[in-house]
From Swiss-Prot:
Residues 532-545 have a biased composition (Low complexity). It is found in: Cytoplasm. GO terms for biological process: protein refolding. This is Chaperonin GroEL. It comes from Deinococcus geothermalis (strain DSM 11300 / CIP 105573 / AG-3a). ATP binds at residues 29-32, 50, 86-90, 413, 479-481, 496. One of its GO terms (cellular component) is cytoplasm.
């Protein structure tokens, strides 16, 4: 396909039109009084949302050059969303402001590369200032506020904080769709993995179709168990203690499984067997996690262990084990806390280095099972459209709460971005030429989120921004929900995670700087529409013979 090349001012202005198209659709959602955007779907009912990244992702422009600008701005929103789960609209508004002010200066003859350097230096100064303003999250009340603001719903904030209280800050919280109208929080206590009993003969409670073992030993074996002679010594030792036994192995089959079932049915030994969770190296690591939680050892040939030589002190212990057809839950494992902490730290170190989203998700699950537990928030609603929108708000609020725990919270409502302006102005005075202009571009952009929040609430943005900038109170700001100024935004519960504010600014400046330094665009040439086929002669009735 033939390509079209566009240069200089024409290229940059085309990108700007695309940026504005996305930003204008997204920015109406900003703040407590932001408006909804309705998105048409080819199949099913339309989506109604106040989420910036959801709106941005739906925008496709007909003009190919403008569409490139739109895609670049969408990148700001999606990158911010990937890292923090929130702040996408703020990032979009900042990006639009940087592009607008920057292109005005480039058109006036400024050096784009010097402007970009100035913007980058200003962003570094601003992010340092944001870190200084951050307040650590000490209690669930702060989590409740920050999650509630993200979702625009105090009830959502309360449920996220409630779930975090139950499973701890490291715990896994999943959001699922409920079959009923109500939203409820379920907590899975203990360590759970998705493998159930190998045979239904191990069931102890036929009404609930589950096996429950109280104060049980746990044999953790890496390989398959099929020969009875290997298993017999450990069975005899456990039988002498009159305690139940859970066997976790790659598989239990043949005469070994038959013997376990016979002993269970005779009442000689209360026993159950489940397959080990995971596959390959991940299975080995998960077995080591179970060993740490229960205070046992993994029986592995790699470590020189043989099944027939297993002693009671190599077995794990737990106060209660519940096994269903699909999952096993170990409650109150008797592991050594120091060993569990060592496993947690090892997983955290691995999380820092992994690039794969799938690996990160699995590591996060393992971390939760070791550190706290798993909470499931089942979101209920009256209609499918409401359910989708509500579930999305819960997911955003959860990501925001996690970001708040990581780097603390700052004053919301665009106030923090206004508070870092003096530091950026000070930097601009130390720079020269177009670099100083670049820093001043960021100063103007930092005002834009607060202006937009005020505008969406029906107020005059410039008046609000000037009032906040002229105040000597460090957390003085504007509550757009009530239309009043507040002496301390953090105390009033109007907060944002510092990580969200920082990431939004960094991503906006990164893509904004790239657009300013663009000198040419290469894109596909629009295809010419083919002329319609000629109609038949009139006297032939429009038909061919």
């Amino acid at each position: 396909m033939a390509k079209q090349l566009v240069f200089d001012e024409h290229a940059r202005r085309s990108l700007e039109r695309g940026v504005n198209a996305v930003a204008n659709a997204v920015k109406v959602t900003l703040g407590p009084r932001g408006r909804n955007v309705v998105i048409e779907k080819k199949f099913g009912s339309p989506t109604i949302t106040k989420d910036g990244v959801t709106v941005a992702k739906e925008v496709e422009l007909e003009d190919k050059l403008e569409n490139i600008g739109a895609q670049l701005l969408k990148e700001i929103a999606s990158k911010t969303n990937d890292i923090t789960g929130d702040g996408t609209t703020t990032a979009t508004v900042l990006g639009q402001a940087i592009v607008k002010e920057g292109l005005r200066n480039v058109a006036a003859g400024a050096n784009p590369l010097a402007l970009k350097r100035g913007i980058e230096k200003a962003v570094a100064a601003a992010t340092e200032e944001i870190k200084k303003l951050a307040v650590p999250v000490e209690d669930s009340n702060a989590i409740k506020k920050v999650a509630g603001i993200s979702a625009n719903d105090a009830q959502v904030g309360e449920e996220i904080a409630n779930a975090m209280d139950k499973v701890g800050k490291e715990g896994v919280i999943t959001i699922e769709e409920s079959k009923s109208f109500d939203t409820e929080v379920d907590v899975v206590e203990g360590m759970q993995f998705d493998k159930g009993y190998i045979s239904p003969y191990f069931i102890t409670n036929p009404d609930k179709m589950e096996a429950v073992l109280e104060d049980a030993y746990i044999l953790i074996n890496e390989k398959k168990i099929s020969a009875l002679k290997d298993l017999l010594p450990v069975l005899e030792k456990v039988a002498q203690t009159s305690r139940p036994l859970l066997i976790i192995a790659e598989d239990v089959e043949g005469e070994a499984l038959a013997t376990l079932i016979v002993n269970k049915l005779r009442g000689t030994l209360n026993i159950a067997a489940v397959k080990a969770p995971g596959f390959g190296d991940r299975r080995k690591e998960m077995l080591r996690d179970i060993a740490a939680v229960t205070g046992g050892q993994v029986v592995s040939e790699d470590l020189g262990h043989r099944l027939e030589n297993v002693t009671l002190d190599m077995l794990g212990r737990a106060k209660r084990i519940r096994i269903t057809k699909d999952e096993t839950t170990i409650i109150d494992g008797m592991g050594n806390q120091a060993e569990i902490d060592a496993r947690v730290n090892a997983i955290k170190a691995e999380l820092e280095t992994t690039d794969s989203d799938y690996a990160r998700e699995k590591l996060q699950e393992r971390l939760a099972k070791l550190a706290g537990g798993v909470a499931v928030i089942r979101v209920g609603a009256a209609t499918e459209t409401e359910l989708k929108e509500k579930k999305h708000r819960y997911e955003d609020a959860l990501s925001t709460a996690r970001s708040a725990v990581e780097e603390g919270i700052v004053a919301g409502g665009g106030t923090t971005l206004l508070r870092v302006i003096p530091a950026v102005k000070q930097l601009a005075e130390s720079l020269e030429g177009d670099e100083a202009t670049g820093a001043r571009i960021l100063v103007r952009a930092l005002e834009e989120p607060a202006r937009q929040i005020a505008a969406n609430a029906g107020d005059e943005g410039s008046v609000i921004v000037n009032a906040v900038l002229n105040s000597d109170k460090p957390r003085y700001g504007y509550n757009a929900a009530t239309g009043e100024f507040v002496d301390d935004m953090v105390a009033a519960g109007i907060v944002d995670p510092a990580k969200v504010t920082r990431t939004a600014l960094q991503n906006a400046a990164s893509i904004g700087g790239l657009i300013l330094t663009t000198e040419a665009i290469v894109s596909d040439k629009p295809e010419k529409e083919k002329a319609p086929a000629a109609a038949g002669a009139p006297d032939m009735g429009g038909m061919d013979f």
